[in-house]
Every structure is written in structure tokens, then in C-alpha cells.
Amino acid sequence: MTARYLGMNRSDGLTVTDLEHISQSIGDILRTPVGSRVMRRDYGSLLASMIDQPQTPALELQIKVACYMAVLKWEPRVTLSSVTTARSFDGRMTVTLTGQHNDTGQPLSLTIPVS
């Protein structure tokens, strides 16, 4: 299969293709607080404002919705079918996104550390 997209890995400068770039892009979207980019104030997610809140079922739902809405708005290459969260005892949180790559129909499953 030929890559439809070539980009650059932010950490080592090497070439990345389709799914690698989508993963990098979604990580950036979720970790960027809304309002923090000067020329694009609405870019990012509301996730940063929720990270240190008390653990409740309502907060977990808000986190999932914040992730889903940010990816829906800023990453048109994927369609999500589920968003799940997991927190470890040391306070780290990961978000697992499952869905489909829109161009190829290929299933997509990404686990992204967000804290």
C-alpha cells in the first residue's frame, strides 16, 4: 500500500506516514489546551482543565466527550467509534481511541498518554 501522507516525526525528525501521523496529530490535539495557540485559539481540547479534578463518573464522561469533540473537529482523517480512559495509581492517564481511517477504511486503535 502506498502512503497517502508523508510527514515528519516531532521527536526525531524521521519520516512518518498515515497512521503514525494521525497518532501524532491526535496526541497534539488532546494535549493542547484550548486558547493556548495565539493564531488559532480554538485549537486543542478541554482535557487539560479536567486532568486534576476529583475522580467521578461525571468527570470521566466529560473527559470522553472532550476527547471525542476535539478529534471530531480537528482530525478529519478518522471516524471514532469509542473513547475509553484509564488512570494508573501514580496519576497517569491514557485515552484509547478506536475507529476507522476514513480514506482506507482501515480499523484504527490508538492509546495516547495525556498526563
UniProtKB/Swiss-Prot annotation:
It comes from the Viruses. The keyword Secreted does not apply. Pfam families: GPW_gp25. It is found in: Virion. The keyword Secreted does not apply. Gene3D superfamilies: 3.10.450.40. Keywords: Late protein, Viral baseplate protein, Viral release from host cell, Viral tail assembly, Viral tail protein, Virion. Its main location: virion. GO terms for biological process: viral tail assembly. Induction: Expressed in the late phase of the viral replicative cycle. One of its GO terms (cellular component) is virus tail, baseplate. Baseplate protein that is part of the outer wedges of the baseplate. Probably plays a role as a connector between the central and peripheral parts of the baseplate. Plays a role in tail assembly. Belongs to the GpW/Gp25 family. This is Baseplate protein W. It comes from Escherichia phage P2. The lineage of its organism: Viruses, Duplodnaviria, Heunggongvirae, Uroviricota, Caudoviricetes.
